[in-house]
Amino acid sequence: EEYQQIFKTRLQEDSKAAGRWNTSDGGEYFAVGVQGAVTGRGADLLIIDDPHSEQDVNSPSAFDNAYEWYTSGPRQRLQPGGRIVLVMTRWSTKDLTQRLINAQSNENADQWEVVEFPAVLPNGKPVWPEYWKIEDLNSVKASAGLAKWNAQYMQNPTSEEGALIK
């Protein structure tokens, strides 16, 4: 009820599917997974949530497939003036986030505002100290290995070789 007091829009009575529903004011929600078909649809807002899995780290073609899906599917469906939100765990220097960041070196390509939340801030304090104590984060870092730590916790993927100090 609190939601309904703030937002007057309602779901249409016949909207029952979790991955697709319409509002009484003409809005639509449509969800697919990576590699899912979006042909014939337009979008004012695209939200891409975790296009990679942990298993993708061991499959370079999975990163290529996700990028190909994005560029030939969802990106092509974005209406003029539309927006894209990409929320993901960083996994690799070849993941979708890195590919999009690299592409923006072309001034005509999509330009992204990147918002990152590293587990440990430059001042050495946890980004979320109420949940993660620095001692716990240091334990994760020591247990996970530097490459995983840099990618998943610090939002700064490196190759396994790049994570080693020689």
Model-identified regions with their sequence ranges:
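Conserved nucleotide-state-sensing and coupling region of NTP-binding domains
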Residues: 1-38
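A glycine-rich helix N-cap at a beta->alpha junction
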Residues: 2-10, 117, 121, 128
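ATPase catalytic-site recognition across NTP-hydrolyzing enzymes
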Residues: 124-166
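A short acidic, Gly/Pro-enriched loop at the edge of an enzyme's catalytic core
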Residues: 42
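Active-site donor-binding loop signature of nucleotide-sugar glycosyltransferases
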Residues: 33, 117-119, 155
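A short acidic, often aromatic-flanked loop/helix-cap motif at beta-alpha or helix-coil junctions
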Residues: 37-39, 121-126
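Short, conserved catalytic or adaptor-binding loops enriched in Gly and charged residues
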Residues: 12, 20-24, 103-109, 142-143, ...
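Signature of the SF2 helicase/ATPase Hel1-core->accessory helical subdomain module
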Residues: 45-122
